[in-house]
Amino acid sequence: MNVWPFETMLIMTDSEVLFFKKLQLALPEFLIFSQVQLSRIIEPSDEAGQDRRFWFNRVCRQSVDFVLIDTDCQTVLVAIELDDWTYDSQDRQRQDAKKDKALSSAGIPIMRFHAEKMPGIDMLRVDVLEVIRQFG
């Protein structure tokens, strides 16, 4: 087959686009990346020893909705998830718990917001800066 069977797809849902714009307005001094694979921001520590591949495989296919990066373009300040109706499923909650545990063990705070209860821009700024202050 000379032509591969691929097509473009949207990178974010409508709710994620709205939230992304709110993040940009609330936190203009930071860089915001969307749909970031965990394997791009965390890796198994030396403590994993020969089990590095096992731990890597636990998170390599997972992603976070948004990552806030310092202006040095290297420091991850906080991971942000926008939960929607799919968050109610037990499987999704198990996956999210695994994601939260991995990020926490790497020292990256994770914040969760619900798509139907997004905070306003001012409150979003206050909440995110408080988490950065606590963990920074």
Where are these regions (language model features)?
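Short low-complexity, flexible loop/linker segments enriched in glycine and/or proline
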Residues: 47-49, 125-130
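Conserved alpha-helical elements of sugar-nucleotide-dependent glycosyltransferases
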Residues: 15-19, 95
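Short secondary-structure junctions
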Residues: 26-32
